[in-house]
Amino acid sequence: MLGALAKKIFGSSNDRRVKGFRPRVAAINALEPEISALSDEQLRARTQTFRDQLAAGTRLDDLLVPAFATVREAAKRVLGQRHFDVQMIGGMVLHESGISEMKTGEGKTLVATLPVYLNALEGKGVHVITVNDYLASRDAEWMGRVYRFLGLTVGTIVHGLDDGQRKEAYACDITYGTNNEFGFDYLRDNMKYELSQMTQRGHHFAIVDEVDSILIDEARTPLIISGPVDDRSELYVAVDTVMPRLTPEHYDLDEKQRQVSLTEAGNEFIEEELRAEGILKEGDLYDAHNVTIVHHVNQALRAHTLFTLDKDYIVKNDEVVIIDEFTGRMMQGRRYSEGLHQALEAKERVTIQPENQTLASITFQNYFRLYKKLAGMTGTASTEADEFAEIYKLDVVDIPTNKEVERVDEDDEVYRTVEEKYEAIIKEIDKAHARHQPILVGTGSIEKSELIGELLKKAGYTLLDYSDPNALTDVYKAARENRVTKRFAVLNARFHEQEAYIVAEAGVPGAITIATNMAGRGTDIKLGGNLEMRIEKELGQMPEGPERAAAIEALKAEIAENRAKVLASGEKADPEAGRKKDLPGGLYIIGTERHESRRIDNQLRGRSGRQGDPGRSKFYLSLKDDLMRIFGSDRMDGMLQRLGLEQGEAIIHPWINKAIEKAQQKVEARNFDMRKNVLKYDNVMNDQRKVVFEQRRDLMGQDSVRETVDEMRHGVIDDFVAVHIPENAYAEQWDAEGLKHRALDVLGLDLPIEEWVKEEGIADEEIRERLRKASDESYAARVERNGAEVMTYVEKQVVLQVLDHLWREHLVTLDHLRQVIGWRGFAQRDPLNEYKSEAFELFNGLVTALREQVTAQLSHVEIMQQQPEGFADGGFESAGFSEPQLPPMFPEHRDPVTGENEFAFAGSGSDGGAGGAYGFAARELSADAAVLERNPDDASTWGRVGRNEPCPCGSGKKYKHCHGRFATEA
């Protein structure tokens, strides 16, 4: 109470911060008459003037006022849109590395032009991140008109681009793209073997649109590039044979949380059985070198206790097929990850499909923290303000709306059963549709969307077919004639262009649109219809002229008339029904369930009431909804029965809303803790990832790594001497024979070490020096024999390839370690500290193995066919070996709503994954088709050819060493 009083008197901290931006807004407004008087050429010339000022030492912040004023004028001339004062404030928040919370329809896309232009003046690249390819392309084209008018370059990163196209896009002043594309490009760049092959040029400044979706909702689902792994089917089968011998006393099962763990008795039993089967060969089960076996045991245990045949999965055509728990449908093509699917295959004795190994991964949390400067925009961030501040050091500023919000948010209606809830929803849709009020029905999943669609069909509605060119024509005609169409649309999140079009037309009188809570973000729902979309669809082929101008005016008039109908579509007061006042028209939001996050509910509500429009929202709940079960539906069910509620009746009260919000706050706090915990563990891997990636980049940037190779060889010798000639040990205790074998195996040197140790007074330092001298002489001879230039190339490639191989194995080991480290808590040890300690030891082991394996390979390398002349002009193939190739790679990122790999279906519905020229599975068909169309004798049919692809002429050489070389010379 006192806090509310103080806020009323002094204002909130947010109000004070917004007020602090007002003087600069006034300064920008004061410049407007002067800048409006400039010609287009003079306005464009200001960009170079600003750059000259920066070069002379002017601070970027000092250019904010004139730069923002310049962008506002450019937008007025190019787009016909003028930034409001509150949009200027939003732009300042973004420039200062904050999050601008702006309500739906307040023009976030236009706001971004202000800080993007200002920061692009530095020439270091600005990245604008959107949630899908359609929005990236749309915004780059739409706002790109402003940037290009002012002399800046704009690029777009979308699926299917090759390296050359990506590099061009990243070289632009401003680059638009999706979070997935930016993240995967970073991972792939750090798997390249030449600096010239890398596409990104650094991480200077990024603005993340829908920042809450990307940095909160997707924070726990890492981007993963995976590749085929060695066949482990025998180990899956061997471990599976032990599982049927377990009894309930051997494990603790929590079906509600879907978790299972071995008891102490279970651990002892499993260890004995694994030893008897010859699987556990040495040490205890939970020793670090046995993490792979522990991983297999855990997955086999889950397969046998948590998953039931014909309930969770079925066996069909020698395959384990997952059954969706909500719909009961088979989910062809979906597989459980982390070896669980292979464990189920072993359990059912079907063919075990190969699993993929993680080649590289990163979470969005750690990717976006690479940027020196980060900012974000969204309509809903306040509920997660603490998380943005703690994890990303980003402050959330709530930007005032240009006009007051007129939407009415009604209290929830709570029903006893799901059936009663859905019956009430269909009745409400019927009533609103009869008034021609547009309705947006929000659901928590694609399956629930389909369920609502089926219920509407049973009620006599038909699904709108957007593949029919006349479908929308009929809708517009019905709106003009005040007819009820009884048609509805369902958003399909896999086709973003269609999705945006459906959302854009969801404000037409009588429109019924069913969507998941997340679908369609980024596209406004305008009451009456979307003029730009209709011009594009209906008048796209009509040439400029009086006829087109008249048609546009007719569309404007029709949309204005439709808007008036929508505004008048509200529900009138009905005292008998307990409704004392009129409810507004505008877009009617119907929520079919509460999400566990208040933010997602607010996003759904925020679709209505844009820019001062009226609107209405209401949530329909049942006691069987997930959140209501958490809240305690048994108690509430009893309360409803005592109140005498009959079937089909609902309880509506503000107290219910408050209770649900408290439940949501608890869930949000739990999820925040989980994300923080994930980040703590991921930070351990992230620190190691940064070291490895920096070392790789440093190695690629060197003309020669000979000095590094020599240091590695000397380090290996030091390790050998330390192991076989321990410090302070007597000469009789030295292991001369072991040292001799290691020198022969790794260094390729057959040395009389046993004779050396017999010499009077010889010390370990002397033996070390002799080994170094012998290895240096041997290696120098090898370099001379194979050719210095060839060996310089080979050294770099061997170091990089061995590092990559060991890093991939290290990732798998860390992943397995992370899964079992929680058990240390039972021994009163902190699992996180244990993980840090063991991860550090494993990383030290990686460094030691890197030295030894690089030394061993280079100490035995021989070039089979040495042709120095060919090497000089034909490439490394003529010298007897080929350049390293990237392994087969598959991008993976699980959608936090559906759980699907967003790239698993890319080959069937769009142009593939994030792969471009990388040979991802989703790209294979289209890539092969392109090759088949090339005529070896006609270079004009070749199209863009990758430098490392086989030359289309059929010579067998790489393109860069064949016709690509001629093209370069030309």
Curated annotation (Swiss-Prot):
Its cofactor is Zn(2+). ATP binds at Q87, G105, E106, G107, K108, T109, D524. Its main location: membrane. It is found in: Cell inner membrane; Cytoplasm. Coiled coil: none annotated. GO terms for molecular function: ATP binding; metal ion binding; protein-exporting ATPase activity. GO terms for cellular component: cell envelope Sec protein transport complex; cytosol; plasma membrane. SMART domains: SecA_DEAD, SecA_PP_bind. HAMAP family: SecA. Part of the Sec protein translocase complex. Interacts with the SecYEG preprotein conducting channel. Has a central role in coupling the hydrolysis of ATP to the transfer of proteins into and across the cell membrane, serving both as a receptor for the preprotein-SecB complex and as an ATP-driven molecular motor driving the stepwise translocation of polypeptide chains across the membrane. Belongs to the SecA family. This is Protein translocase subunit SecA. The lineage of its organism: Bacteria, Pseudomonadati, Pseudomonadota, Alphaproteobacteria, Hyphomicrobiales. The gene is secA.
